[in-house]
């Protein structure tokens, strides 16, 4: 789910949009203190979160496959120009996931191309 679209990478999204993103990692998760995660949230730096089908972040393995704090899937730098995320948004193509419903294309690369004038 898009938690904040303050980053140019997420300019093509709306807060609350839900995307299905491939997850392919055996290790790693977002960890930080409660104080820091609250500060990140207050500053709009939590970009994306793992959510259930109703858009609610959770800690259940079916929702949050790696146990990330606050179900954080992605964060940004203070200016939003750097986006770090766990899911593989680059692993999409038309018809690739025929048996999995959902929206896949967050337009990350299109938005970045437009912002950075590439």
Residue ranges: model-predicted function:
Residues 1-118:
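Amide-donor transfer/coupling interface in amidating biosynthetic enzymes
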């Amino acid at each position: 789910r898009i938690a904040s679209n303050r980053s140019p990478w997420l300019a093509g999204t709306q807060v609350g949009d839900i995307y299905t993103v491939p997850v392919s990692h055996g290790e790693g998760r977002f960890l930080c203190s409660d104080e820091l995660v609250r500060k990140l949230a207050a500053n709009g730096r939590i970009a994306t979160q793992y959510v259930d089908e109703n858009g609610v972040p959770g800690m259940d393995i079916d929702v949050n496959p790696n146990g990330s704090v606050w179900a954080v899937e992605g964060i940004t730098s203070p200016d939003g120009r750097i986006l770090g995320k766990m899911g593989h948004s680059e692993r999409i193509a038309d018809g690739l996931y025929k048996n999995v419903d959902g929206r896949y294309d967050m337009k990350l690369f299109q938005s970045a191309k437009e912002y950075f004038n590439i």
